[in-house]
UniProtKB/Swiss-Prot annotation:
One of its GO terms (cellular component) is nucleus. This is Zinc finger protein Noc. Highly expressed in the adult head. InterPro entries: Elbow/Noc_ZnFinger, Znf_C2H2_type. A zinc finger (C2H2-type) spans 402-430. Residues 70-116 have a biased composition (Low complexity). It comes from Drosophila melanogaster (Fruit fly). One of its GO terms (biological process) is eye-antennal disc development.
Length: 537
């Protein structure tokens, strides 16, 4: 244990199991011992690792400082006029100030300035794991440092002439636990500020040659002093956000944003990743999400897969625009991506210029063929022809919304008109024949013959014409294009070809065009033509 004797008081430093500075002796007060750099270094090093909680005053305070008062400072003195216990009645002349009170380690124009500093010493307590910046301030800059009140500071010790007492410094006030917890400090330029006292007491913090600690340098490299807890919390939050962003993949917090289409598309544009209903659970949906999270779905990264392969579902095609120019557009070939703006089907449906039905010279037909070729299929392929027919029928449905649904037996008119007047005038051509008795009798005989066929022959004999509803709008065309597992395929499907999907002869353009009005469904005989033909031979 080391006992440091000062003028009028004794301060003891408690036992420390890590550091026993028994070799230190009280510094002599002669000459300029407190001003020399060696003395400052010795005082600084003696307080490294010291525990401020073990500091206890051994002598009672002086009687003339028992009541708290206001510490008034003169405008011409270099330091403030004492601690918070000095009464306001004392004049600056009554307190003989020594020039030694303005040393670099004295209080920075604050409390605990020494009234008789010839025998007083300032002990600086430094803890390497307690973040605190004690910058060298001018003694006239006290009023500009009020922002440091809420910042916990490093405990320091002050030795005054009348009371040698060591208390931890917590704020810029000047009071001890025996002072009632209040202090009033007057600044040099008549700018006073009232500050509360922390529970453990406070003393004025002074300038110190001690550099920053390692934790502060790491947490606060830009020089702005902040609380270590605040710095650690902000650093933890930033690290957590960065980790979440990196763990989410190259597309930020949503790793599913580019599974179907290029970046910027809707995250659930792919129906494979869309839940079946709100709040429901689907094993397929969960499996697709798991595969996407593991990077197994093609196109899950900007380069495609984990190895950086290009996305197999995205291709670029140069097409002719309706204005006559050329444009390079991305095309999404994902079969599950129907609502994506890059889908060929969506782009075909968006082409809304008027076009008559069956037109092969308009831009719609060329655009459909270009989209089919962009999908990697030749123009003569059944799928390409069906896509072109579907695009043409969709354009015709927008340009001519009025359709004649007149049916006589299995004959369906199906003509389209742009206005209702044209449709009404066309209907007169059908109803005009009924006014003739001979035409009406012929139509009645035809309908009776159709009903007689249905009674004489069983349905199994008419299986090739399945289904044949008598008044179906698409009975004849849909029967040719609709697939039935037991029906004999059309003659064109028997012709084999080198293509695994069947030759071009296995596709019926008329049937595909008729079926395209019902939706983008293609003839199944084009794919299974060879096997079905071999089975029926």
């Amino acid at each position: 244990m080391v006992v440091l004797e000062g003028g009028g008081g004794v301060v003891t430093i408690g036992n420390n199991q890590y550091l026993q500075p028994d070799y230190l002796a009280p510094l002599p007060t002669t000459m300029d011992a407190k001003k020399s750099p060696l003395a400052l270094l010795a005082q600084t090093c003696s307080q490294i690792g010291a525990d401020s909680s073990a500091v206890k005053p051994l002598l009672a305070m002086d009687k003339n400082k028992t009541k708290p008062g206001a510490c008034s400072s003169s405008s011409n003195s270099s330091s403030s006029s004492g601690s918070a216990e000095i009464s306001a009645a004392k004049s600056p002349s009554g307190q003989a100030k020594s020039p030694k009170s303005s040393t670099p380690i004295s209080s920075t124009a604050t409390s605990a300035s020494l009234s008789n500093t010839s025998t007083g010493e300032i002990k600086l307590a430094f803890k390497p794991y307690e973040t605190n910046v004690l910058s060298h301030q001018n003694q006239n800059s006290f009023k500009s440092s009020s922002s440091l009140d809420a910042e916990p500071t490093r405990p320091s010790s002050k030795n005054s002439s009348s009371a040698q007492e060591r208390v931890p410094s917590r704020s810029k006030s000047n009071a001890t636990p025996t002072d009632g917890g209040k202090a009033e400090i007057s600044a040099h330029d008549s700018s006073s500020s009232r500050k509360t006292v922390s529970p453990s007491g406070s003393s004025q913090r002074g300038a110190s040659p001690i550099v920053r600690s390692g934790m502060e340098v790491l947490n606060n490299a830009n020089g702005t002093a902040q609380h270590p807890k605040e710095m650690s919390s902000m650093a933890a939050a930033a690290a957590a956000a960065a980790a979440a962003y990196k763990a989410a993949g190259p597309y930020g917090l949503n790793p599913l944003s580019a599974l179907c289409c290029p970046p910027g598309m809707e995250q659930h544009a792919n129906p494979a990743f869309r839940p079946p209903f709100a709040g429901g659970f689907s094993h397929h949906h969960a499996a697709m999400l798991a595969v996407a999270a593991n990077g197994g779905y093609p196109g899950g990264a900007p380069g495609g897969g984990p190895a950086g392969q290009p996305n197999p579902y995205i291709s670029y095609q140069r097409i002719k625009t309706p204005a006559g120019g050329e444009a390079i557009v991305p095309v999404c070939k994902d079969p599950y991506c129907q609502g994506c703006p890059y889908s060929a089907h969506t782009q075909q449906m968006l082409m809304g210029a008027p076009c008559p039905a069956g037109c092969t010279q308009c831009e719609h037909q060329k655009y459909g063929l270009a989209m089919a070729s962009a999908a990697g299929l030749p123009p003569a392929h059944p799928y390409s022809q069906a896509a072109a027919a579907a695009a043409a029928n969709a354009a015709a449905a927008r340009s001519a919304p009025y359709v004649c649904s007149w049916v006589v037996g299995d004959a369906y008119c199906g003509k389209r008109f742009q206005t209702s007047d044209e449709l009404f005038s066309h209907l007169r051509t059908h109803t005009g024949n009924l006014s003739d008795p001979a035409a009406a009798a012929a139509a009645l005989a035809q309908s009776q013959a159709q009903s007689l066929l249905g009674t004489l022959f069983p349905p199994s004999a008419l299986r090739a014409g399945y289904p044949t509803p008598p008044l179906s709008p698409m009975s004849a065309a849909a029967a040719a294009a609709r697939y039935h597992p037991y029906a004999k395929p059309p003659p064109g499907a028997l012709a084999g070809g080198p293509s695994p999907f069947g030759a071009a002869g296995a596709f019926n353009p008329a049937a595909a065009a008729a079926a395209a009005a019902l939706g983008p469904y293609y003839s199944p005989y084009a794919m299974y033509g060879q096997r079905m033909g071999a089975a029926h031979q």
